[in-house]
């Protein structure tokens, strides 16, 4: 007997690629089931569709299933019969969603997308300006289609008068016409091949870049037409397809009226005008009338395809523009984003959430009524299987009546059946998690408090949605991958995300505090039980200091075990917590005051040492304890808890006195307005801080008498405890409650100079309240804007990274990035240990003695990074997503550790989306503010020296010095740094040293804490000479390039260089200080920048190290620093900053002053032979940081300004660029205290570098200076290498995330992101193919995404497909060999084991793989 089972397989999803192209009139007719000839829709009396109308049943199919229109044929037995009376085929009514019709247009009509979507394809193809094409189309001008023997030119436009004149002169020797027919003829007549040859010749010959660019654009368009098989005349339509009627429905609403889709109106207009035109042509109407009708037909079709693209939009009866076909697919409400990328799903519900303090971490409370509705199908089947009901109908009735048995069955159904909970907005993957439902009374969903952080939920009325996974596979995935107990770590940072907050923290803090002289102090207990008994009987106080004997086993991270035994000093509260501490963790973790950070450490340590299961149990127990003791503590907020300090009034009086003095000084013109304002702001800030400090003193300490002795102890004030423990509130808020509110900001960020001296306990006066509304209101407005902006940033990030998936184990590269600690302002902000964790080494790590510590390819875990630290390694090379060589994906080695799972990332992980979510999710926490570092914000003191914070050795980097006549070492280099390393050689500090600084110590010297290693003048940058000689001033002319000022008080006179813009004449003078020797030969020339103050006079003698001039630093530093969200967006969009720094494009020597123009200065870079290699023109106002004759390397700064990432990549290389983006982006997040792993930012940067520009096309078909996907270039190079031909040379180009998303290989992904019309227009002309590689494309067509379990399924089905081909099985059969099938082999033991204990088991992953392998999708 044959063991194969054959059955029909209606699988419409069996396609690998999707292609989009232009439709020819024949193709449109082949789709159609008939021509729509009348504009009528339905008969007003019978409500039946009119024949040949827009809803005609003959064309589109029957209205009722298997029933013709007149009712002659009914039921399934007549299927396929065409009724001879009404002409309707007996078929299912759903064919009305699929069958299309068509309209035969009397005259051709141009498709508006190819005309008006910029750049106009028709205009470009015909090499005509869009304006001229439109003139012809809309019947304003004639166009010459065939000049014949006349002097007219082809494509020449003629007005009516000119046309009449030409007819008079040449008769019918030439042809000229107007309208779409003319355009169609021109398109059809174009000989593409000869045009291409002409253009190539033109491209080669032309010198101007503009001409070249135009030629290449047109060439590309013609080549696509040649290659794609599209004919250009198809951009002009002669047949218009009609959408199936059920996609543009007409529905009756109450009151006998009808609601209709706008498309019906638009189609009606087209049909009306088309029919009228037909009549007019039959009647041989005058040309002018016909012409007008043709123009109106063109406009009607334009409106149908894309309303509002040209001229005014056609409006409906409600004065709103009608929604055209283009509007149906684009935008948030369009087909792509509304129905294809996100759909409403069945088996879901939503309700308000409340807190479930008694739940376990993997549970949620589900209201009974809701559960019954959600699990209805399961309940029905159980009722039938259990014999309670014989039919579904009966089961339905039982459920409706809510009989007792129904609830029992519901209990068994939901047992072990996870549900998904989701809270909008879902900003990262933890916004949807799986829980096991517990049935509860009431109507609100109960949520476990510890998952609130991941969902960003609170219980002030938030709602959440519940979804039921139906299939076994989906339940398995929910349990293994999405269960809340499996998502302990945040994928963004790798830190625990289920750490306790708020009341839990308060409770744990309260019971771990100690109190002097509490009842039972000093007693010794032998065990936890003794303490518990004594506490419950009331003989000891919970805060009493006691001694406790302990004996526990402790594991460390390396897996070693040691014993912890002996008597420890502790408190009763801490001893009570000992019961919940699992075996393996040290009591020292608990034996301290537990503030939020410490609790987080306990969870972290538990996860590292004991694994997920024990951590989950511990977290739950900590939560129960926290809730219990915060309730028992009775901590609450009362007005008396805010203690106002006694010295507040005195402090305020003192401040007011100082301000009075300053105002008097200002009135007698001793200080400027700016100084007055800054001083007042400073005084109030200082006072406010002092009042705050004395309030903290008052609130944080209590005086108690113990045995008649007065003692100061830490206070048990409720407000203080809340803030101190990290449960709620902050020092700043407390200051406003009990100190003084202080300074308020205006919406533009500046401070209002009248401070609010009252606090909330005293209450504000009307004026004070009014002052404070300013900032408060801005805060609210900001929040609203910020949320939208952050959401948009996330969307752009997801879009650019969505198709980045780990697709192989190892790409084999030894490329990578150099990692060292991140140092800001001389302090190590992020140690190397943190950055290196979870990365793969790209090169061996070698100690100073030359010993190989770790080999390349090692994945660094916690123990290995400690090893790096112990050996004083301060720089390593790690693999990075940016340098990964895998094409169309990433390899697991370059990505490193999966942060949420603590092991190397799995093949199939969609790391792109995770990266995008990790960066976008904290976006809402980032500020929107643009900081102004002038006036109020810069309350910091100016720094003028560097003191060492760690003892060790100093090392100079890029520092050149000269010795002046006082014997001091003066720095004359620009980008110098001093590095302080400790005894192990690890970098502890790194300081930038400005030019002109005095360095008292030499490189390599030992330093102690507090030693000064550099001093400088903070207010001016000195220009210093490194040669001795006589001064000659050139072009320093008083009143023209400089101004003399004489100070009456000091008797000093100064010479200051003035700006070019202030000069009326002599704009080309360049003030310079030249230093010459005795013979008058020039030794050095120093150009003087605007604002420089001279320190030397003409003919004076200079020594080495003398200051020639000083540039005051006031003007240059007051630039705006963009912070927060806008800065992150700016980095990822790779925007070029205004007045960016100019980098040197090559190595060489700088030559200045040659051939300057009126407005610009010219920088020439010359090689050893004196030839000019590069020239740069700059406005004269830009300040150069290089001198004439200075040697520069490629990428050195020539003129300062903000960094341009594009230049950085071009001149300094990939590594410098990657480093810049990483450090800049991280500094924004660090300011807000958000931790994001570097690899997420690197992942996005990889996607920004997807394209490259061709430097030399080699033997390929590419064109020089064209930018193309890097993957395509690499694939082309592989081919050329095999053939032994010349390869393509290229250089990477940087694209912002929006541009990168729009230029992806997949047109479906790009079209569903932004600019849908443009993307589809371009794709259709190119006959573009979408290979459906990314996630988005697969979601759009309703497939499993090729990542995670979907990738496994895809590989599996590829194997099956291969087998089918080898066996020669036809497509419409599924061939299953049952001989080898044994159902008992499929093991679900791991799911069984969960029944014993509901906490997650590691074996499940194995079972998931087995299950997926054994399931043939």
Curated annotation (Swiss-Prot):
Which E.C. number(s) belong to this protein?
Answer: 2.7.7.6
One Pfam family, short name: RNA_pol_Rpb1_1
Q: Report which reactions are catalysed by this protein.
A: RNA(n) + a ribonucleoside 5'-triphosphate = RNA(n+1) + diphosphate
What keywords tag this UniProt record?
A: DNA-directed RNA polymerase, Magnesium, Metal-binding, Nucleotidyltransferase, Transcription, Transferase, Zinc
**Gene Ontology terms: biological process:** DNA-templated transcription
Say yes or no: keyword Nucleotidyltransferase present.
yes
The annotation note on the cofactor reads:
Binds 1 Mg(2+) ion per subunit. Binds 2 Zn(2+) ions per subunit.
Read off the InterPro entries from this record: DNA-dir_RpoC_beta_prime, DNA-dir_RpoC_beta_prime_bact, RNA_pol_asu, RNA_pol_N, RNA_pol_Rpb1_1, RNA_pol_Rpb1_3, RNA_pol_Rpb1_3_sf, RNA_pol_Rpb1_4
Q: Does Zinc show up as a keyword for this record? A: yes
Which family does the record assign? Belongs to the RNA polymerase beta' chain family.
Q: Give the function comment from the record.
A: DNA-dependent RNA polymerase catalyzes the transcription of DNA into RNA using the four ribonucleoside triphosphates as substrates.
Protein's name according to its UniProt entry: DNA-directed RNA polymerase subunit beta'
């Amino acid at each position: 007997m044959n063991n194969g089972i054959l059955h029909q397989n209606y699988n419409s999803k069996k396609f690998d690629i999707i292609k989009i192209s232009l439709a020819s009139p024949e193709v449109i007719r082949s789709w159609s089931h008939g021509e729509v000839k009348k504009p009528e829709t339905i008969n007003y009396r019978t409500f039946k569709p009119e024949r040949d109308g827009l809803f005609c049943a003959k064309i589109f199919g029957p209205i009722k299933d298997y029933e013709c229109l007149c009712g002659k044929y009914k039921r399934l037995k007549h299927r396929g019969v065409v009724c001879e009376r009404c002409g309707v085929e007996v078929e299912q009514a759903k064919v009305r969603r699929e069958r299309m019709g068509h309209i035969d247009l009397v005259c051709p009509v141009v498709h508006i997308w190819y005309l008006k979507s910029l750049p106009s394809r028709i205009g470009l193809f015909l090499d005509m300006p869009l304006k001229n094409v439109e003139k012809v189309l809309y019947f304003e001008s004639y166009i010459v289609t065939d000049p014949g023997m006349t002097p007219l030119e082809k494509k020449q436009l003629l007005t009516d008068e000119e046309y009449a004149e030409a007819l008079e002169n040449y008769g019918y020797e030439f042809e000229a016409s107007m309208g779409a027919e003319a355009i169609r003829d021109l398109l059809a007549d174009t000989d593409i091949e000869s045009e291409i040859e002409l253009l190539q010749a033109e491209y080669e010959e032309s010198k101007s870049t503009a001409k070249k660019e135009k030629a290449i654009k047109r060439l590309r368009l013609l080549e696509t037409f040649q290659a794609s098989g599209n004919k250009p005349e198809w951009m002009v339509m002669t047949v218009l397809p009609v959408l199936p009627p059920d996609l543009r429905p007409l529905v009756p609403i109450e009151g006998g009226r009808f609601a209709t889709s706008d498309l019906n109106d638009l189609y009606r207009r087209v049909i009306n005008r088309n029919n009228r035109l037909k009549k007019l042509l039959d009647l041989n109407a005058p040309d002018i009338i016909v012409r007008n009708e043709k123009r109106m037909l063109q406009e009607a079709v334009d409106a149908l395809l894309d309303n509002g693209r040209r001229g005014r939009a056609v409006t409906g009866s409600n004065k709103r523009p009608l929604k055209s076909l283009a509007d149906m697919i684009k935008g948030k409400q369009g087909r792509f984003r509304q129905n294809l990328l996100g759909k409403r799903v069945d088996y879901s519900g939503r309700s308000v959430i409340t807190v479930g303090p008694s739940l376990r971490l993997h549970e949620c409370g589900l209201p009974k009524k809701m559960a019954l509705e959600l699990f209805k199908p399961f309940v029905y089947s159980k009722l039938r299987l259990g014999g309670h009901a014989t039919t579904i109908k009966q089961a339905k009735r039982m459920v409706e009546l809510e009989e007792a048995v129904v609830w029992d069955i519901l209990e068994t159904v939901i047992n072990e059946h996870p549900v998904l909970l989701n809270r909008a907005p879902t900003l990262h993957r933890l916004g949807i998690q799986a829980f096991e439902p517990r049935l509860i009374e009431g109507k609100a969903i109960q949520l476990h408090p510890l998952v609130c952080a991941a969902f960003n939920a609170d219980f002030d009325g938030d709602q959440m949605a519940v979804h039921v996974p139906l299939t076994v596979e989906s339940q398995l995935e929910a349990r293994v991958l999405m269960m809340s107990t499996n998502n302990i770590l945040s994928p963004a940072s790798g830190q625990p995300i289920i750490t306790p907050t708020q009341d839990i923290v308060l409770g744990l803090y309260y019971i771990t505090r100690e109190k002097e002289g509490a009842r039972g102090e000093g007693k010794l207990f032998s065990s936890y039980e003794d303490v518990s008994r004594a506490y419950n009987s009331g003989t000891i106080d919970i805060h009493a200091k006691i001694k406790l004997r302990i004996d526990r086993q402790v594991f460390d991270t390396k897996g070693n075990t040691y014993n912890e035994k002996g008597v420890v000093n502790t408190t009763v509260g801490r001893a009570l917590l000992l019961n919940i501490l699992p075996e393996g963790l040290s009591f020292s973790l608990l034996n301290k005051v537990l503030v939020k950070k410490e609790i987080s450490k306990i969870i972290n340590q538990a996860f590292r040492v004991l694994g997920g299961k024990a951590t989950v149990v511990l977290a739950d127990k900590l939560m129960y304890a926290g809730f219990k003791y915060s309730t028992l503590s009775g901590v609450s907020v009362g007005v008396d808890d805010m203690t106002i300090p006694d010295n507040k009034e005195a402090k305020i009086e003192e401040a007011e006195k100082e301000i009075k003095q300053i105002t008097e000084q200002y009135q007698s013109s001793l200080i400027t307005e700016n100084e007055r304002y800054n001083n007042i702001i400073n005084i109030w800030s200082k006072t406010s801080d002092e009042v705050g400090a004395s309030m903290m003193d008052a609130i944080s300490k209590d005086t108690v008498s113990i045995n008649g002795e007065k003692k100061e102890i830490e206070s048990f004030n409720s407000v203080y405890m809340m803030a101190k423990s990290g449960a709620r509130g902050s020092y700043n808020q407390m200051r406003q409650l009990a100190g003084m509110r202080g300074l308020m900001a205006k919406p533009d960020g500046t401070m209002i100079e009248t401070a609010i001296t009252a606090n909330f306990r005293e209450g504000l006066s009307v004026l004070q309240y009014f002052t404070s509304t300013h900032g408060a209101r801005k805060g609210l407005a900001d929040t609203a804007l910020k949320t939208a902006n952050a959401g948009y940033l996330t969307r752009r990030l997801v879009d650019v990274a969505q198709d980045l998936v780990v697709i192989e184990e190892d790409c084999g590269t030894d490329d990578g990035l150099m990692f060292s600690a991140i140092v800001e302002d001389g302090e190590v902000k992020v140690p190397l240990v943190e950055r290196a964790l979870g990365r793969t080494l790209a090169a061996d790590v070698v100690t100073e003695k030359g010993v190989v510590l770790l080999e390349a390819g090692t994945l660094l875990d916690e123990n290995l990074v400690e090893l790096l630290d112990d050996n004083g390694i301060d720089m390593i090379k790690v693999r990075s997503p940016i340098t990964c060589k895998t094409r169309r994906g990433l390899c697991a080695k370059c990505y490193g550790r999966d942060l949420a799972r603590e092991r190397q990332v799995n093949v199939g992980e969609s790391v792109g989306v995770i990266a995008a979510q990790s960066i976008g999710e904290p976006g809402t926490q980032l500020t929107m503010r643009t900081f102004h570092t002038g006036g109020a914000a810069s309350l910091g003191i100016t720094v003028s020296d560097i003191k060492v914070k760690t003892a060790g050795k100093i090392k100079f980097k890029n520092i050149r010095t000269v010795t002046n006549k006082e014997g001091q070492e003066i720095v004359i280099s620009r980008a110098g740094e001093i590095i302080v390393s400790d005894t192990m050689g690890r970098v502890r500090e790194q300081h930038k040293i400005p030019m002109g600084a005095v360095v008292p110590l030499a490189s390599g010297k030992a330093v102690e804490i507090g030693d000064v290693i550099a001093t400088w003048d903070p207010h001016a940058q000195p220009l210093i000479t490194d040669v001795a000689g006589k001064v000659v001033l050139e072009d320093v002319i008083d009143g023209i390039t400089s101004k003399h000022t004489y100070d009456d008080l000091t008797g000093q006179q100064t010479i200051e260089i003035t700006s070019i813009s202030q000069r009326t004449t002599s704009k080309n003078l360049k003030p310079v200080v030249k230093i010459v020797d005795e013979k008058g030969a020039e030794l050095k020339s120093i150009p003087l920048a605007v604002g420089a103050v001279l320190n030397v006079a003409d003919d004076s003698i200079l020594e080495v190290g003398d200051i020639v001039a000083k540039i005051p630093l006031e003007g240059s530093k007051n630039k705006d620093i963009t912070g927060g969200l806008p800065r992150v967006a700016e980095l990822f969009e790779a925007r070029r900053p205004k007045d960016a720094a100019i980098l040197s494009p090559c190595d060489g020597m700088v030559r200045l002053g040659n051939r300057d123009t009126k407005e610009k200065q010219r920088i020439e870079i010359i090689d050893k032979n004196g030839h000019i290699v590069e020239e740069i023109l700059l406005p004269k106002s830009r300040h150069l940081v290089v001198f004439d004759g200075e040697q520069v390397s490629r990428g050195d700064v020539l003129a300062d300004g903000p960094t341009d990432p594009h230049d950085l990549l071009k001149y300094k290389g990939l590594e410098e660029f990657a480093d810049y983006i990483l450090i800049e982006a991280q500094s924004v997040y660090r300011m807000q205290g958000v931790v994001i792993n570097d690899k997420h930012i690197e992942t996005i940067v990889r996607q920004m570098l997807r394209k490259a520009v061709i430097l030399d096309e080699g033997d390929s078909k590419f064109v020089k200076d064209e930018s193309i996907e890097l993957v395509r270039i690499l694939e082309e190079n592989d081919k050329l290498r095999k053939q032994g031909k010349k390869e393509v040379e290229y250089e990477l180009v940087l694209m912002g995330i929006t541009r990168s998303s729009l230029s992806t290989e997949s047109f479906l992904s790009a079209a569903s992101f932004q600019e849908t019309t443009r993307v589809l227009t371009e794709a259709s002309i190119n006959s573009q193919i979408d290979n459906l590689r990314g996630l988005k494309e697969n979601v759009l067509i309703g497939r499993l995404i090729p990542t995670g379990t979907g990738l496994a399924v895809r590989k599996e089905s590829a194997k099956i497909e291969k087998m089918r081909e080898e066996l020669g099985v036809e497509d419409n059969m599924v061939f299953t060999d049952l001989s080898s099938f044994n159902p008992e082999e499929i093991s679900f033991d791991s799911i069984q084991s969960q029944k014993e204990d509901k906490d997650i088991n590691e074996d499940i992953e194995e079972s998931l793989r087995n299950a997926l392998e054994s399931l043939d999708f």
